[in-house]
């Protein structure tokens, strides 16, 4: 769905583990890494699109994750001119995204990048929380920064809790 301003409705998905690290995925056959994301189909809610994209891109089902939060509003980014398809109607000049923060509840083995038979990613890894903001392609950086800042209040306590648990476990009597 492309709105009257030329922005395609899209969902972004950030999956975190119990340590507050986030899943970072490499686009199939490329050297670029990003969070899973995808378009919202006509008649589909943002949450429905998120679950569909979650399965298509990383093979996870609703029972594998827990929704921790979502962005309060839709965030937009413009595509660089070289990526805008002028011959398509309506012309899409960028994405407007509703972001979801999910916690992985199942084992990592549930992640299957080839679940749909048409992989969008060919590798993934856990990275520190702020790492993606510095590493994503430049035209998505501002949206990533806003999303990560909004979600930090939810995710960073996971890191603090785990860090405290590790310290307690390392004490010697």
Swiss-Prot record:
Q: What class of enzyme is it?
A: hydrolase
Per the UniProt entry, what is one GO biological process?
mRNA catabolic process
Q: Write down any Gene Ontology CC term.
A: cytoplasm
PROSITE patterns xrefs: NUDIX, NUDIX_BOX
Q: Which InterPro entries match?
A: Nudix_hydrolase, NUDIX_hydrolase-like_dom_sf, NUDIX_hydrolase_CS, NUDIX_hydrolase_dom, RppH
Q: Where is this motif: Nudix box?
A: 38-59
| Gene Ontology molecular-function annotations | mRNA 5'-diphosphatase activity
Q: Where in this chain does the record put each Nudix hydrolase domain?
A: 6-149
Per the UniProt record, which EC number(s) apply here? 3.6.1.-
Q: Which cofactor does it need?
A: a divalent metal cation
Tell me the keywords, alphabetical order: Hydrolase
What's one Pfam family the UniProt record gives for this protein? NUDIX
The record's comment on protein family reads: Belongs to the Nudix hydrolase family. RppH subfamily.
Q: What does this protein do?
A: Accelerates the degradation of transcripts by removing pyrophosphate from the 5'-end of triphosphorylated RNA, leading to a more labile monophosphorylated state that can stimulate subsequent ribonuclease cleavage.
Q: What is this protein called?
A: RNA pyrophosphohydrolase
- Species of provenance: Shewanella pealeana (strain ATCC 700345 / ANG-SQ1)
């Amino acid at each position: 769905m492309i709105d009257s301003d030329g922005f395609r409705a899209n969902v972004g998905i950030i999956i975190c583990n119990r340590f507050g690290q986030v899943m970072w995925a490499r686009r199939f056959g490329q050297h670029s890494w990003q969070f899973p994301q995808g378009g919202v189909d006509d008649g589909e809610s943002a949450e429905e699109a998120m679950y569909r994209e979650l399965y298509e891109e990383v093979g996870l089902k609703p029972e594998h994750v827990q929704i921790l939060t979502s962005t309060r509003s839709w965030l937009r980014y413009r595509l660089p001119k070289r990526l805008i398809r002028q011959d398509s109607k309506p012309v899409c000049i960028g994405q407007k995204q509703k972001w979801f923060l999910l916690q992985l509840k199942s084992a990592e083995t549930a992640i299957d990048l080839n679940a749909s038979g048409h992989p969008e990613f060919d590798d993934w890894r856990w990275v520190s929380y702020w790492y993606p903001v510095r590493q994503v392609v430049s035209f998505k950086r501002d949206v990533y920064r806003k999303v990560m800042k909004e979600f930090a209040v939810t995710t960073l306590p996971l890191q603090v809790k785990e860090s405290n648990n590790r310290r307690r476990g390392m004490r010697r009597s």
